[in-house]
Amino acid sequence: MPNASRVVIVAGEESGDHHAAELVKQLKAVYPDLEISGIGGKHLRAAGVHLISDLTRYAVTGLTEIIPFLKIFRKAFQDIKQHLSTQKPDLLILVDYPAFNLRLAKYAKKKLGIKIIYYISPQIWAWKGKRIHLIKDCIDKMAVIFPFEKTIYENAGVPVSFVGHPLVKKIAAAKDKHSGRTSLGLPLNEPIIALLPGSRHSEIERHIPILVNTAKLLTLDNPKLRFVVPIAGTINPDKVKAYFSNQNLTVTFIQGQAIECMSAADFVIVASGTASLECALLEKPMCIIYKSSFLTYVAAMYFIKVKFLGLCNLLANKMMVPEFLQYDCNAIELSRYISNFHNDPNQAKSMINQLAKLKESLSSSQADCSLFDLVVAELPEKNA
């Protein structure tokens, strides 16, 4: 078994930080002498990882949104390169975050010859498909979370294992609606809509004004309607609350606990991303929103080659959940859809049935192995 092996792990966003921390906890429980360092956030720090940088505080996406933080990202990249050169780890685990991590993989493999596992694949099936050539050259093992990704990598000759989706296990432990409302202090018998604007600063700025106006229109039809807004750890709560002040809306703000908020709701409006898949796995009636800067939108229209943005729709290869994107992402369209949805119980039943099938396809029971087993297999047998 590994003895005092050195592992470096890099997770640049909050969701990756959380998933990586779960892996670290499993590794530390069995191999307490493992030396683990890298880039991450509060979850990896709490799991005992020595952090070189924390990039989860600078959660941005898009062409224009990233510009103010370029110096920070460059410094973090130089710092982790120096750390790899000094530490010479037995294994480098890269978690999602492809713009940063694929550059790091190239350096770590070509310059230092480090063994690399990449967990949570870049979305090469959506855009930048040529990245697969770099992956083939630099990554020793892909650990993918969607079954169809395994086929893509196998066809390209890249070593790959489907390790199940980390959210399935997390969702299995989630509270039901009644328990969720009780734990959050929400009323048991009133209609509640959860509003999830995203975890990036640019998403907050673009989505929350739309969500506030949507909530106001919906409340005109149903004054008893309440809203719950989970606030990501990357966001200043006061900034979110300010948008809702003096709007005559009944809103409960919760720090974190997005899954609990979605479980407690009757319906969810969620920004495209990890939370939208969490909502789908909860089998919760929902719709997906997203609005970016104009330049990012134009670039996406040109480069992205998939029909859908929501992960649940991509996986199903059909529009099982409606998407309100860019110019369609507005209060009038959203409120009209939600009002019609609530007046037609068959829509909810159909959506829930489809989401249940999706959830089963991503379960760990379908996986080749666990991420933990995959990582342990790649660590050296130092005492052998």
Curated annotation (Swiss-Prot):
Pathway: Bacterial outer membrane biogenesis; LPS lipid A biosynthesis
Enzyme Commission no: 2.4.1.182
Coiled-coil region: none
One Gene Ontology term of the molecular function aspect: lipid-A-disaccharide synthase activity
InterPro entries linked to this entry: Glyco_trans_19
Catalytic activity: a lipid X + a UDP-2-N,3-O-bis[(3R)-3-hydroxyacyl]-alpha-D-glucosamine = a lipid A disaccharide + UDP + H(+)
Any single GO BP term: lipid A biosynthetic process
Alphabetical UniProt keywords: Glycosyltransferase, Lipid A biosynthesis, Lipid biosynthesis, Lipid metabolism, Transferase
Enzyme class: transferase
Highest taxon of the lineage: Bacteria
GO cellular-component term (any): membrane
Family from the record: Belongs to the LpxB family.
Protein function: Condensation of UDP-2,3-diacylglucosamine and 2,3-diacylglucosamine-1-phosphate to form lipid A disaccharide, a precursor of lipid A, a phosphorylated glycolipid that anchors the lipopolysaccharide to the outer membrane of the cell.
PANTHER family: LIPID-A-DISACCHARIDE SYNTHASE, LIPID-A-DISACCHARIDE SYNTHASE, MITOCHONDRIAL-RELATED
Name listed for the protein in its UniProt record: Lipid-A-disaccharide synthase 1
Phylogenetic lineage: Bacteria, Pseudomonadati, Pseudomonadota, Gammaproteobacteria, Legionellales
